Swiss-Prot record:
Name of the protein in its database record: Protein RecA
Location relative to the cell: Cytoplasm
CDD domains in alphabetical order: RecA (cd00983)
GO MF annotation terms: ATP binding; ATP hydrolysis activity; ATP-dependent DNA damage sensor activity; damaged DNA binding; single-stranded DNA binding
Similarity comment text for this entry: Belongs to the RecA family.
NCBIfam families listed in its UniProt record: tigrfam_recA (TIGR02012)
Length: 331
């Protein structure tokens, strides 16, 4: 078969697969993202770029997972604040009973208008989530976390009783019921998940996420967030650098990574993201340890350059605007 005929046959096969399994079920890694999909910005410029469509896709299920203290909740709080800034209504299902209102407020969440539920059981949490989504009144719902969605039978049962597979069955049923409703209501549904170790795995990756396989399958986007290093000021630890990898995406080519600075008390560092992306686009020159724009020196070392931008909000805004224009991102 000639190269031309092979290409035609491949295009035909791709069209048939998309027709049968839906748009985004198959794509070439070099293909552009589907920009017709409406998205809510994630609150991180670097992550919006990695996601390919400028944020979290509406009408889809998103899974954010990672080890403890890697920044999962911070990432979702920024997304919630972003949805509210666009005039949207946000619901937070706090199955872990661990939401810190003061921290949420510091990250820009309007806690007075946040719809909050702290359910007693997993079934109750998912029923409340389904009812809110069906109402068509919310734009984003966050479930924190899948690991904390404990089935009622497990709570009511004896501590020594065997409850293998209960949570997986509960999640599987919930995903089947909710996926269609989420799509019709155009809501962004974010499930936060933890990482567990599989017992007895000798080869391959021993890590897995709780809740069975249903969430993996039904998610249009899966984000893995991992802590890379500590950010220190002298001997004091003031934040962490985390890497967010787009492990799965049905709306854009996956496997892209965003590196973000999470500062304690204030969340994702806007100046850090703008600085790194400005260097990448040659808007800021980096020579050795020095950062400069033409004759204007921003500072020696990344931390000093970040501080310079924070002290000059006009310059920071100007650079951010240029970065957003280049990557076709909305505010």
């Amino acid at each position: 078969m000639s190269d031309n005929k092979k290409q035609q046959a491949l295009e035909l096969a791709l069209k048939q697969i998309e027709k049968q399994f839906g748009k985004g079920s198959i794509m070439k890694l070099g293909d552009g993202a589907d920009h017709s999909i409406e998205a809510i910005p994630s609150g991180s410029i670097a992550l919006d770029i990695a996601l390919g469509i400028g944020g979290y896709p509406r009408g889809r299920i998103i899974e954010v997972y990672g080890p403890e203290s890697s920044g999962k909740t911070t990432l979702t709080l920024h997304a919630m604040a972003s949805a509210q800034k666009q005039g949207g209504t946000v619901a937070f299902i706090d199955a872990e009973h661990a939401l810190d209102p003061n921290y949420a407020k510091a990250l820009g969440v309007d806690i007075d208008n946040l719809v909050l539920s702290q359910p007693d059981t997993g079934e109750q949490a998912l029923d409340i989530a389904e009812a809110l989504i069906k109402s068509g009144s919310i734009d984003m719902i966050v479930i924190d976390s899948v690991a904390a969605l404990v089935p009622e039978a497990e709570i009511a049962g004896d501590m020594s009783a065997n409850h293998v597979g209960l949570q997986a069955r509960m999640m599987s049923q919930a995903m089947r019921k909710m996926s269609g409703v989420i799509s019709k209501s155009n809501v962004v549904a974010i499930f936060i998940n933890q990482i567990r170790e599989k017992v007895g795995v000798m080869f391959g990756n021993p890590e897995t996420t709780p809740g069975g396989r249903a969430l993996k399958f039904f998610s249009s986007v899966r984000l893995e967030i991992r802590r890379a290093e500590a950010i220190k000021q002298g001997s004091e630890m003031i934040g962490i650098k985390s890497n967010v990898k787009v492990v799965k995406s049905k709306v854009a080519p996956p496997l892209k990574t965003a590196s973000i600075d999470i500062m304690y008390g204030t969340g994702i560092s806007r100046s850090g993201e703008v600085l790194d992306l400005s260097v990448e686009l040659n808007l800021v020159n980096k020579s050795g340890a020095w950062y400069n724009i033409g004759e204007e020196k921003l500072g020696q070392g990344r931390d000093n350059a970040k501080q310079y931008l924070e002290d000059k909000p006009e310059l920071l805004n100007e650079l951010e605007k240029k970065v957003r224009t280049h990557f076709k991102l909305t505010k």
